């Protein structure tokens, strides 16, 4: 094949695209011809069960052609970069460097606090890695979105999850130096305030969700996994939205990052992972993190394209992101961009001396000096500045821009110094939408050391019970939950999604059959068998405005999702005021022939976490009411379902008891329609007594009631 004919000496966009198509087409034909002429009948030979050599090579060929096409598109975007692009990058990189310098000074010197001490906050500089700003210029940005905007509610741009040191990426999306400073010090102007004005920063990391910047977390893979969940939501909601998840080579070793990439590859999600090789994690070199030849190889196992770029070249960041976005929104799926770079500073401000060494020689610093010198010579600020001068930008224009950025950061620092510190008691605000946190003083004030005198307004008289069991016509515990799931799906329509393992056939214990019978099969999504990313995906869907209902099949398996529940879902509201309307159903409990790992009773794991709402209904009526009500809350809710109560043994519990009830579905739905709370967060007296109070939940409600009836025969009323 001949692909070059009367080609122009230089290409423009249309001619380059036409040439690329001809080149890829010729390459495709050539590879096919080579396979057929060289291997012939061997192509039909089975090389692994149910897969022929021809099919194996065909898939390799398809991947190779995708790689070639993406490479040519990167060339096109790279060559389309203008001086205007480069001036914006230089300005943003200068802003980042100025801000980093100021934050380091604040950390070193501290800012005076009301008690007379000094506090410098914390922070992570991006020295030599400022080229990340160019990612944003390839995205759909809305830097002027209002402060109360959220994705789908005033902000309709792309989303980014920066690493903790990617301050420049946040600035390029629309974050401001003052917001970054306020977040680093936790002052009242911080947008990491749990949604409470003047509460100050609860998280000294940065973020600006109103312009699409997801605040990072200390367990670093959480951000990538959550962004994967947001990409999952965009896929479900048919949104024209792209997602960027940044991670370092150290954090890329984590299981949750691999789980996230695996989900993205399995579902073809619109996301790119930017994996930055910093040459060292905190203190651990890359060779002790992974055996890959290049970090881009990590995408191979997940089945999507990856490539490597030089992190000191802003145009490479821009072109790579532009191609990843183009590919994803055309339906190509995820990509991974491996960035070779180096941080020219310690992991955090306090780490500089250990990393680089103190001028005194103690400590000497442990970083390799040859490596340091190599990357110092590639510092993007001076090298890219020199390129701009070569391209005709005047020194006067560059110096004016640099003076403007320096002045803007100085102005922000002045405003920071005038900003108030938060009042300590505000730290308790906004733990969930139902309640604030208690202080130790609150606990002491409630304690009197005396039994409560008998009340004349007790809801039930001694021996009187609040409910009864139905011998005929009642619902089992399982049926009540199934009906609630179907009613939630009907109520929320396309915003509702049910995710977990084995969901599309029937779900654990066949609980999804009612959804299928009610016409909601399209809302059931099978997920890879990895509980952490199932929960993270639910969090991302919730942040995107959906109403996800997550299933973890057994109580013991919730341990695999513990980080996702406790360090992600539970903290979102308290950290930065985000709604996370996600319900997580977890079957658990003994007397079910389940054994270890399945029957674990896990309420104590989560009930002590202030950001989670934990429900453990004991009756069909409570199961219906609480699941319906919990699914309306803007908080992460755990619905703990004792398997022994399901009624799997002919409608009886695991210990042979009938607990079926005639369930009233109207009352709770009326309360929901009126915006009123009903049962969630409240106790209920189910038997009146005078001698002792038993507080219990779940399956133990029935056993406690039996015990009370037995003791009543001895004259003891509970």
List each model region and its residues:
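Glycine-rich ThDP/TPP pyrophosphate-binding loop and its adjacent helix/strand module
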Residues: 1, 212-411, 417-418, 607-718
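Residues forming anionic-ligand binding surfaces in small-molecule and nucleic-acid pockets
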Residues: 83, 100, 105-111, 197-210, ...
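Short coil/turn connectors at secondary-structure junctions
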Residues: 86-90, 119, 154-159, 176-181, ...
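A short glycine/serine-rich beta->alpha loop
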Residues: 116-125, 166-168, 210-219, 470-472, ...
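Cofactor-binding active-site loop characterized by glycine-rich and histidine/acidic residues
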Residues: 118-267, 285-303, 596-598, 605
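Thiamine diphosphate
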Residues: 134, 211-279, 309-327, 497, ...
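Acidic-glycine-rich active-site phosphate/pyrophosphate-binding loop
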Residues: 189-207, 295-296, 505-518, 667-676
């Amino acid at each position: 094949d001949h692909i070059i004919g009367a080609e122009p000496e230089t290409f423009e966009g249309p001619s380059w695209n036409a040439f690329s198509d001809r080149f890829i087409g010729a390459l495709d034909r050539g590879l096919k011809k080579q396979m057929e002429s060289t291997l012939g009948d061997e192509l039909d030979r089975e090389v692994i069960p149910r897969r022929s050599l021809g099919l194996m090579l065909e898939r390799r060929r398809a991947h190779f052609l995708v790689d070639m096409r993406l490479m040519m598109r990167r060339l096109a975007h790279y060559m389309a970069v203008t001086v205007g692009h480069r001036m914006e990058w230089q300005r943003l990189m200068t802003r980042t460097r100025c801000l980093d310098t100021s934050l380091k000074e604040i950390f070193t010197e501290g800012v005076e606090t009301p008690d007379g001490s000094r506090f410098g906050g914390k922070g992570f500089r991006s020295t030599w890695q400022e080229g990340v700003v160019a990612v944003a210029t390839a995205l759909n940005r809305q830097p002027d979105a209002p402060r109360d905007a959220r994705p789908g509610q005033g902000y309709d741009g792309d989303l980014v999850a920066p690493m903790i040191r990617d301050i420049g990426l946040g600035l390029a999306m629309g974050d401001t130096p003052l917001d970054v400073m306020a977040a680093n010090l936790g002052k009242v102007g911080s947008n990491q305030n749990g949604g409470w004005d003047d509460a100050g920063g609860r998280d000294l990391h940065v973020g600006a969700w109103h312009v699409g910047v997801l605040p990072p977390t200390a367990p670093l893979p959480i951000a990538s996994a959550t962004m994967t969940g947001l990409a999952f939501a965009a896929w479900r909601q048919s949104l024209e939205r792209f997602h960027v998840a940044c991670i370092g080579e150290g954090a890329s070793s984590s299981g949750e990052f691999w789980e996230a990439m695996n989900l993205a590859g399995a579902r073809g999600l619109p996301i790119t992972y930017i994996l930055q090789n910093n040459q060292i994690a905190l203190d651990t070199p890359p060779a002790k993190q992974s055996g890959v030849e290049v970090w881009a190889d990590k995408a191979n196992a997940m089945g999507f394209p990856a490539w490597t770029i030089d992190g000191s070249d802003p145009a490479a960041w821009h072109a790579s992101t532009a191609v990843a976005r183009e590919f994803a929104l055309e339906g190509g799926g995820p990509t991974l961009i491996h960035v070779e770079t180096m941080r020219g500073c310690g992991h955090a401000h306090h780490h500089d001396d250990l990393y680089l060494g103190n001028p005194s020689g103690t400590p000497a610093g442990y970083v390799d000096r040859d490596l340091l010198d190599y990357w110092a010579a590639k510092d993007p600020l001076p090298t890219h500045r020199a390129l701009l001068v070569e391209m005709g930008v005047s020194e006067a224009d560059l110096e004016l821009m640099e003076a403007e950025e320096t002045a803007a950061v100085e102005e922000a620092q002045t405003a920071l110094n005038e900003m108030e510190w938060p009042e300590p008691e505000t730290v308790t605000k906004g733990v969930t939408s139902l309640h604030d946190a208690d202080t130790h003083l609150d606990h002491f004030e409630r304690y009197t050391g005396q039994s409560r005198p008998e009340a004349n307004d007790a809801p039930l008289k001694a021996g009187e019970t609040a409910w009864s069991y139905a011998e005929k016509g009642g619902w089992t515990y399982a049926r009540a939950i199934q009906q609630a799931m179907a009613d939630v799906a009907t109520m929320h329509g396309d915003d509702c999604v049910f995710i977990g393992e084995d969901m599309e056939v029937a779900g654990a214990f066949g609980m999804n059959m009612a959804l299928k019978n009610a016409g909601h099969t399209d809302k059931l999504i099978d997920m890879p068998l990895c509980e952490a990313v199932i929960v993270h995906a639910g969090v991302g869907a919730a942040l995107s405005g959906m109403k996800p209902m997550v299933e973890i099949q057994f109580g013991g398996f919730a341990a695999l999702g513990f980080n996702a529940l406790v360090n992600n879902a539970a903290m979102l509201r308290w950290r930065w005021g985000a709604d996370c309307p996600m319900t997580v159903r977890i079957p658990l409990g003994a007397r079910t022939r389940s054994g270890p790992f399945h029957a674990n009773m896990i309420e104590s794991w989560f009930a002590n976490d202030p950001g989670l709402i934990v429900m453990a209904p004991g009756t069909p009526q409570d199961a219906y009411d609480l699941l319906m009500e919990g699914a309306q809350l803007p908080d992460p809710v755990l619905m703990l379902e004792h398997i022994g109560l399901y009624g799997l043994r002919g409608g009886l519990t695991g210990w042979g008891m009938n607990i079926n009830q005639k369930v009233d579905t109207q009352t709770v739905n009326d309360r929901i329609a009126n915006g009123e709370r009903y049962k969630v967060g409240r106790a209920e007296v189910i038997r009146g007594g005078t001698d002792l109070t038993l507080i219990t939940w779940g399956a133990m409600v029935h056993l406690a009631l039996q015990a009370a009836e037995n003791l009543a025969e001895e004259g003891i009323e509970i």
